[in-house]
Every structure is written in structure tokens, then in C-alpha cells.
Amino acid sequence: MKKKYYITISLIVAIAILIIDQVTKRIIATTMNIGDSYEVIPNFLNITSHRNNGAAWGILSGKMGFFYIITIVILIVLVLFYIKEAKYNLFMQVAISLLFAGALGNFIDRLVNGEVVDFVDTNIFGYDFPIFNVADSSLTIGVLFIIIALLKDANSKE
């Protein structure tokens, strides 16, 4: 019999991502000055200490009140979506857990520091991609998983 909710797996995913996110940000914040950069893979990956008081790519910079409200709303919506729409679907539940952990990780930064610590600095095919962190990666992967789950669900109904 299929389980309705995979709470243990969902919690393990969310807590693991949250811990990795917060620990890596703490390491960067306490061991590097803003702007310091270390090359990891030449012409591809650097660890660069950066702060962002906006959203992705620095949009809405300095609008912390907005981010507090919207993040709380998003976290509530994710919990409701998990309960109502992700029954019996482990893949969807993991996707929601990734989104929840990513949103919560950056929310903690904004709440505690008034800004988000970013440090993964990539250059992909000559494009200097905006600096990001583990929470941002979790959000991106979570969105991709949601899209895959929705497409798979739509195809199975045809």
C-alpha cells in the first residue's frame, strides 16, 4: 500500500538542505570578507563572498518588509499544497520540501542579517552567472521537480 505522505523523507530532505545552507553561509560570512574570491575550477567556479539584500539578481533590493511577508505566505502555501495536492506522490513531496527549505534558508538570512549570503560564483559558457547559495539551488531544483511532476501527472491523465 502506498503511503499518503512521506513525512520522514520530506523532513530529512528539508532539514538536510537547511543545515547545509546555513552552515555554508556561516562559513563564508565568518572566514571571508565581502568580495573575497577563491578559484575552485578555473574559468568555471569560484567561491566569492557576496551579500544580497534583494531577490534573485538583486531585484527589489532593500525591500525587506515585502520579503518577510511574501516568504511567510509562500511557506504557508507550500504546506497547504503539500497537504492537499501531493498525496501519494513522493516526488512532488520532495520537490515541495526543496522549495520550503530554500525559501526558509534565505528567510532566516534576511531575518537575522538583513541580507542573504551568496557565494557560488559560476561562469557558464562565458556567461558570468549571478552569485547564489545552497538555498537558491534548492529552490531551482524544487521548481524543476514540480514542473516534471506536473508534466508527468498531466501525461498520465491523457
Curated annotation (Swiss-Prot):
Pathway listed: Protein modification; lipoprotein biosynthesis (signal peptide cleavage)
InterPro entries: Peptidase_A8
EC number: 3.4.23.36
Active site residues according to the UniProt entry: D118, D136
Catalytic activity reported: Release of signal peptides from bacterial membrane prolipoproteins. Hydrolyzes -Xaa-Yaa-Zaa-|-(S,diacylglyceryl)Cys-, in which Xaa is hydrophobic (preferably Leu), and Yaa (Ala or Ser) and Zaa (Gly or Ala) have small, neutral side chains
GO CC entries: plasma membrane
Main location: membrane
Alphabetical GO biological process terms: proteolysis
Superkingdom to which the source organism belongs: Bacteria
Alphabetized GO MF terms: aspartic-type endopeptidase activity
EC category name: hydrolase
Compartments reported by the entry: Cell membrane
N-terminal signal peptide: none
Its membrane topology: Multi-pass membrane protein
Family: Belongs to the peptidase A8 family.
Protein name in UniProt: Lipoprotein signal peptidase
Organism: Staphylococcus haemolyticus (strain JCSC1435)
Gene responsible for this protein: lspA
